[in-house]
Amino acid sequence: MTFSFIIVLLISRNSGLHAAELKLATIFSDHMVLQCDKPLTVWGWADPDESVTVSFGGQSKSVITSVNGKWFLKLDPSKASAKPQELIARGKEGRKLVVKDVLVGEVWFGSGQSNMAMAVGSANNFEAEKAAANLPLIRYYSEASLPADKPQAKGKGKWEICSPESVRRFSATLYFFGREIHREVGVPVGLVTASAGATHVESWLSAEVQSSDPDTKAEYEAQLKAWVGFDEAKFKADYEKKLAAWKFAFSMGKSSEKDKPSDPDRMIAHIKGKGGPSGLFNARVFNLAPFTLRGIIWYQGESNSGLPGSNQKHLYHKQLSLLVTSWRELWGDELPFAWVQLPNFTAPGEGWPRIREAMLKALELPKTGMAITIDIGDEKDIHPKNKQEVGKRLSYWALGTVYGKKVPAISGPLPTGSTISGNSITVYFKHTNGGLKSINGGPLAGFQIAGADQQWKPAVVEIKGDSVVVTSPLVAQPVAVRYAWKDLPDCSLANGAGLPASPFRTDDWPVPQVKK
């Protein structure tokens, strides 16, 4: 998908916007941050065939609008600046729009489900974080449009200046990441987010991408059919029947308050709030592109961990890869892209290990990174509160790879291959940063080894430089090894910087089915 094609797509889908007046895309508003050192795309609407001029930082560029009034132009790159400036758009008959208090710095987009949406107000040590949040050079924009069945050109959001009063609403993961970038790079930081709890990755992928890929087409069509077929009236009628049955059982002493059917209005709002396949891409991502960014952060996967196991174990890997490549195409830029690997948490089946594996495999894409969080989750809370460390680990990757800064490590250890010799398997790692080590100084736990019978046995592990040698007295001829392959695994292996190793497996045996 070329940049010119993206422009045509955006122009052709103006979703009912009638350009009777000069307008800028919603994200171009007071207190915004523009990306430094890259050409800046600015767009909006006016009358057809109208000349529009945009001025910023001592430069002016003009463009003639399309037949439906949409316009795009590119400003030359600007240096980072904490000095408030104005971005001005001018049209015919003296029409003018002025965006005030515009800074230039580093802009990152964060998206995903509830762990990306989780606010600073819900994270660890909020009172201390609140007191330290007088950081006016950090700005935050949250896109909050309702899910839609078609791509929407107009967004819903506003820029906020970081302060002790506003920070409680900011995405915790994105804020703690951005704060590290601000501290280390020393320029203004803009944080743009679009996220929604309990959402599948399918909600964030375009219909075109999902329906045209042979691996995702069937799943997309099944979800679309279920979404289109959702009958609100029938849903409420079914609730009334269930409620009547519960009342009768309750009166007979055969049921309790906890068995009462859920409020249908809340359930319907939850279903509609997530949207169908592509619903959040249409509403919250499409309108942001091609706003100039430095990179993207993704935190999602929990909801996809319940998909069927062995016959679709590849699907999240494919979907995440499509998300990266299709969003890059939409923006017309091979943006650096990192995600948070799912942390330790008590969940049924092998869904979480499978999603972690998919995330590990997706690192094959260029300019990607992953924060391994297998040691900082919460076994009972799917929303772990230590988002400070999540943001810091993401920042290590960005600072080390995007900005060329010296960091303790850009990642925890990642497996690069393995060899079998007699009764042992040697696994090799990269990102060891001073050598592998045991997190607690004791024997390495969480490793299992298996022979051709595919029966996993506890393993004995010896560290040798940047590799580990795995054996078991119960397996004479091993063929495969795995590490931390549980929802709530033993986490024992780290690099010299103390960052944990990613879970992995060397086999490709079918994964047991995971029930929804």
Predicted regions and their residues:
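Cell-envelope and extracellular/periplasmic
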Residues: 20-516
